[in-house]
Amino acid sequence: MKIRFLSPAAQELEDAFQWYEDQMSGLGYELIAEIYEAAHRIMAWPEAHPILGHTLRRCLIRRFPYGLIYGIEEQTIIVIAVAHLHRKPFYWTPRI
């Protein structure tokens, strides 16, 4: 399986990285490492995470208040949001 981030999700990841780097040097890279680990968990076990709605799933990010919101299309994982879990729930639904 491969994984693809939609443009808005990639921008959210970049924004989160920059915010954490501004807080403490190196913290943004720790976020990226946790996202990388989550992406590998998703690719290994794509259906292991809780379902949101009918077809989407959410994989929580360790140590950070984020979740990867994703769908499965044939052999590709589509990440539609790198969602901050304490802000605007379900803001990403128009991307579906």
Outline where the language-model segments fall.
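Alpha-helix N-cap/helix-start and coil->helix boundary motif
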Residues: 10, 36, 66, 85-86
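Enriched for short, Lys/Arg-rich terminal
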Residues: 29, 67, 71-96
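Short His-centered aromatic/hydrophobic patch
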Residues: 63
